[in-house]
């Protein structure tokens, strides 16, 4: 399928909107009340630091809502204002934050149900309004909605769209797209739908398995068993790993994405030599600026002396999880929570350790002077961070 031609056709449809409805001023007050925080503004102005009695809070210097998320949420609010009576759907969560999605439900925005990992569009009717979330939607979903005669409001982050353009270039040149991402993440599903031949690698370990196979060190059967659910239909590692381009899910850990890119460049250089390298490998630059800024700020924060770290964001938020990984890699007590209510008045905290289920830790905040580092994912409003800090202050006073 010519996905580029389909996008161009869709963008010219009078039932498609990706620029909003000119109602920014009308929804500004609602957005400010729901998501912004004067306390967080004051902490920023005070060098990202707050001291209250024995408690010191250190905020990362880049955290919370990124531009793409702000844009998506604002467009969703504008959509409800522009279509006050119509049924409005979202193909998934608008962003990976429970409080934001709850606010949209309160505005009578409907969410497409998912059964067994498959979205059920049977309830969507001609004339309904459907919002595509910040991390995009697959080509197949867009086709279905367009053919059904829906009004499509596309809030896809421009950085995600940039990745789609990258994999389309790979496809045009008959290159396989190596996508650094989580195979079931909505953004990676969308990106792979725009690619031709593709292979998704989760991390550097999986990338090394692919590199080894390229250099003749792997076993075909075990390779296909490992990647059977992470590749395009009909993928043949003996045929489809000769010409590679690298792209990524925009919320992955920047340093790992860069290392994976360097690994495949070295691998193709080793196999084909410097003269033919450009015929077998395409360089890339699809790392989101906002993701990079938040990760860099987190690295700076963990270089300070903090007694513990609180990382705030949805449990299905990839960029939040990677912020947590940074703290854990430095041996810092770190707690990933999705809402302020996870911090309890009895000084316990319900949190999600990396790769584990929710657990409760007692005696969360230690006695005596304590410095708490705080960051939040790109889908977390300042108002949520404020409520977390308020709970920490209350605990420190007990």
Swiss-Prot record:
The active site is at residue 187. Its cofactor is [4Fe-4S] cluster. (2E)-4-hydroxy-3-methylbut-2-enyl diphosphate binds at residues 96, 185, 250, 317-319, 379. Gene3D superfamilies: 3.40.50.11270, 4-hydroxy-3-methylbut-2-enyl diphosphate reductase, catalytic domain. It catalyses: isopentenyl diphosphate + 2 oxidized [2Fe-2S]-[ferredoxin] + H2O = (2E)-4-hydroxy-3-methylbut-2-enyl diphosphate + 2 reduced [2Fe-2S]-[ferredoxin] + 2 H(+); dimethylallyl diphosphate + 2 oxidized [2Fe-2S]-[ferredoxin] + H2O = (2E)-4-hydroxy-3-methylbut-2-enyl diphosphate + 2 reduced [2Fe-2S]-[ferredoxin] + 2 H(+). GO terms for molecular function: 4 iron, 4 sulfur cluster binding; 4-hydroxy-3-methylbut-2-enyl diphosphate reductase activity; metal ion binding. Isopentenyl diphosphate binds at residues 96, 185, 317-319, 379. HAMAP family: IspH (MF_00191). This is 4-hydroxy-3-methylbut-2-enyl diphosphate reductase. It comes from Synechococcus sp. (strain CC9311). The lineage of its organism: Bacteria, Bacillati, Cyanobacteriota, Cyanophyceae, Synechococcales.
